[in-house]
Amino acid sequence: MATRDYYEVLEISRTADDGEIKKSYRRLAMRYHPDRNPDDASAEERFKEISAAYEVLSDPQKRQAYDRFGHAGVNGGGGGPGAGFGGGGGGFGDVFSDLFEQAFGGGFRGQDSGRGADLRYELELTLEEAALGKEVTIQIPSSATCEVCRGSGAKPGSAVEDCATCGGRGQVRMVQGFFSVTRPCPQCNGSGKVIKEPCTNCHGHGRVRRNRDLQVKVPAGVDTGDRIRLNGEGEAGERGGPAGDLYIQVRVLPHALFERDGDDLHCAVPVQFTTMAMGGELEVPTLTGRAKVQIAPGTQSGAVFRLRGKGIKGVRSKLNGDLHCQLQVEVPVHLSARQKELLEEFAREGGDNIQHPQQESWWNKAKDFFDRMGL
């Protein structure tokens, strides 16, 4: 199946700024999140498609490559947030390197060919963990420098000779027509050395596979789509080359009480109709405990109370957002005979003496409508 345009996937224009991209991603990710759509394979695929589009369009370099070359410009970049671990790289440089591979029959990566690959890890957090920050331990399956040969790839004590093909330079020059290109030596893979006796532990690669535990400090205020970069924590480099980086993609799980909008939180609070009518004190939940709000007599259903500073601390601004509590009248069910009797008495006693501002406003609007329609 053909890959859809990433701007179409996120339902944004090609001129959308970073804020619009992030806002649309949050909205769509919340709608198609697998936790909200259990047993719905199409929603899961849509969520993966949305995540892949956001990974490209939220990165300025990847977006530039995508805008110019389409999907071909970003095909080397690995999976989206749902891909777990994956190799990094890709982007603008790969487009041109592919041209050289076609012309000269090999890769062109320059002198940095021994650098380890980047890794990606998807980290799931609860809303509380994302809001307050947390130190987590993650297990990374990756390659590490061989402890026996210390990354050289050679058996300890054995001789390592200069490569005869490149004369120990690690590079060869290839000429075709008007083009002259320097590329890593295919004989020694750019190292300039030839191993006569490979290390028995790593078989000459200088790296071994292992799982390692890594402590990660997640800053307070992160949100779905945010990315944490840890320099040098990716794959080990080949034969002593520099290690790649580790990119931790954050995904915040849906919450039972709160919905997040940037640094603000929204919460629906059920309230008894007697409290709304007569007023009183109400306890509402916050991320750090309980808070009390005063309900004025006659408060209408749908009223919103804003608790300043009870939202989430911005990861960059360091300012706390607000908590918006929307009051919703809860109509009682399964009334006893006595309760029904009291309500009937209340209705009889009310008559025209009790004011219902929303009802009166609605009927006035309805009357105007009927008059205009001649009904």
From Swiss-Prot:
Cofactor(s) annotated in UniProt: Zn(2+)
Zinc finger (CR-type): 133-211
Cofactor note: Binds 2 Zn(2+) ions per monomer.
Domain J: 5-70
Subcellular location: Cytoplasm
CXXCXGXG motif-type repeats, residues: 146-153, 163-170, 185-192, 199-206
A GO MF term: ATP binding
Residues binding Zn(2+) 1: 146, 149, 199, 202
Keyword set, alphabetical order: Chaperone, Cytoplasm, DNA replication, Metal-binding, Repeat, Stress response, Zinc, Zinc-finger
Keyword match Iron-sulfur: no
Gene Ontology biological-process entries: chaperone cofactor-dependent protein refolding; DNA replication; protein refolding; response to heat
One cellular-component annotation, GO: cytoplasm
Pfam family, one: DnaJ_C
PROSITE patterns: DNAJ_1 (PS00636), DNAJ_2 (PS50076), ZF_CR (PS51188)
Residues given in the record as Zn(2+) 2 binding sites: 163, 166, 185, 188
Family the entry assigns: Belongs to the DnaJ family.
Described purpose of this protein according to its UniProt entry: Participates actively in the response to hyperosmotic and heat shock by preventing the aggregation of stress-denatured proteins and by disaggregating proteins, also in an autonomous, DnaK-independent fashion. Unfolded proteins bind initially to DnaJ; upon interaction with the DnaJ-bound protein, DnaK hydrolyzes its bound ATP, resulting in the formation of a stable complex. GrpE releases ADP from DnaK; ATP binding to DnaK triggers the release of the substrate protein, thus completing the reaction cycle.
HAMAP family: DnaJ
Family annotation (PANTHER family): CHAPERONE PROTEIN DNAJ (PTHR43096:SF48), DNAJ HOMOLOG 1, MITOCHONDRIAL-RELATED (PTHR43096)
Domain comment in the entry: The J domain is necessary and sufficient to stimulate DnaK ATPase activity. Zinc center 1 plays an important role in the autonomous, DnaK-independent chaperone activity of DnaJ. Zinc center 2 is essential for interaction with DnaK and for DnaJ activity.
Subunit comment: Homodimer.
Descriptive protein name: Chaperone protein DnaJ
